[in-house]
Amino acid sequence: MTKKIEVAQIRVLFLGIWRFLQHLRLRLVEDQINIRAGHLAYVTLLSLVPLVAVTMSMLSAFPVFKGIRGQIEAFVYENFLPAAGDTVQIYINEFVGNASKGTAVGIAALVVVAIMLISAIDKSLNNIWRTKEKRSVVVAFSMYWMVITLGPVLVGASLVATSYVVSLKLFEDDTFSGVVPLFIERLPMLFSVAAFLLLYMVVPNQKVKFLHALLGALVAALLFELGKKAFALYVTQFPSYEAIYGALATIPILFVWVYLSWMIVLLGAEITAAMPEYLDYESSFDKDEASTKT
């Protein structure tokens, strides 16, 4: 009897997952996330140098982050730009160096272009959530400015805190000798989950449940980590881009990776937004079924 109940529960669970995946598939087709990911990839490449320039300027304004700029750059390029990270880092640093020598008008233009990227992300995610109420211009600008100014500071502070914790004498003990390498190895995954969770909780102009956002963040972070490894393997083992483009191979490689990254981000957002819709549908379906039985 107990085994029959367990089998029935497992069957209901898998049936529920299947229904959710069907609902998610319809959502993905309707929202055309491949087209949105292409748009965001284009805007990202256009805004990449201005965003990095503004970020580094914000970090240089705080003396405590002066010594960790190199660590932040290395961490980002190694963990978020597979295979072509070193080459991209050289070019972007050169572009940022040129951009930082500009006038006040030029720097203001960089900030505007960086805000364009954040605005595009905001609009794309709110479209996924079917948000009807738009933020006012003042509120939207305040949020974008907060992301540009506080975002780099929070990233720098988290890396400083991590470096401090890892350097504590407590972790020099043999008991914790294996903990530090394991923690450092999992750090990119933890940062990815935290970033996706924050994105899915804060950007939509409506209330998002923590567990729904956490599910989307976990799926997106896992796909992001797997995507990094798979993409790096493809680029290194099947160097077709280098054979075709030669010295310019970094450009299409970067564009393809940015496009895939946005596909993953939007997929996580779709999962988060689809959860309450699916649960409401299941709840109403159960009520209708119960009413027909009575």
UniProtKB/Swiss-Prot annotation:
The chain crosses the membrane at residues 45-65, 102-122, 137-157, 179-199, 213-233, 247-267. Keywords: Cell inner membrane, Cell membrane, Membrane, Transmembrane, Transmembrane helix. NCBIfam families: PRK01637.1 (NF002457), yihY_not_rbn (TIGR00765). This is UPF0761 membrane protein Sputw3181_0272. Pfam families: Virul_fac_BrkB. Disulfide bonds: none annotated. Belongs to the UPF0761 family. It is a multi-pass membrane protein. Coiled coil: none annotated. Its main location: membrane. GO terms for cellular component: plasma membrane. It is found in: Cell inner membrane.
